[in-house]
Amino acid sequence: LIDVLPAWGTNLTRRVISKPKVFLQDSTMAASLVGVDAESLEMQISSSFTGGLLESFVATELLKQRERSAVPFNLFHFRDSTGKVVDLVMESRSREVVGVEVKAAVSLQGKDFSGLRHVQKLAGNKFRCGILLYAGKESLPIGPGRWAMPISTLWSV
C-alpha cells in the first residue's frame, strides 16, 4: 500500500541519517484522500497537491518498470541541508546515477534544474543523466547530460 524511498547520498552515513520519503502506491487513492479529482487536477485548483501526486505516480511507475529493467536499480530521493531537492534518484548496483525531477508545470524555469545539477556534481563520473519530467509536450536538452521530457515518455520507452 505504501512505498518508502530512502535518502540518496554519496556515502552510507548520509543515507542512514536522512529521513525516508513515504508515499501511497495508488495515486488515485492518494488523490481521493486529499479531495482531488480529475477536474480539479486539470484546472489546477488543487495545485498544492498536484506536484506531490504526480511525483508519487511517477515513482510508482518507475518501481513497476524496475522489475523489467535490463539494469537493476534502487530508487531514492535527495534533499540536502541547503534545500536542494531531486524527487527521485535511480542508482545501479555499480553506483551509476540517474536523477529524475517531476514538475506538474507545462513550462519550465531555470531554477527547476538546480537539484539535478547538484546531484550531477555530487555523483561526479557516476552521473549518467538527469531527466526533468514535466507536463509539456517537447523533449528538450537542458545541459550536458540533462533533458526535459514529457511525463508521457514513461510509456513510450
Language model features by range: what are they?
Residues 135-157:
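Domain-level recognition of nuclease-like catalytic cores that cleave nucleotide substrates
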Residues 67-68, 118-126:
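Arginine/glycine-rich "motif VI" loop of SF2 helicases in the C-terminal RecA-like domain
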Residues 79, 103, 133-134:
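Short beta-strand/turn micro-motifs composed of small residues
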Residues 32, 109-110, 139-143:
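Switch/connector loops and helix/strand junctions flanking conserved nucleotide-binding motifs
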Residues 1-97:
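Accessory nucleic acid-recognition modules appended to NTPase machines
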Residues 102-110:
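Short beta-strand-loop-alpha-helix junction that forms the active-site gateway
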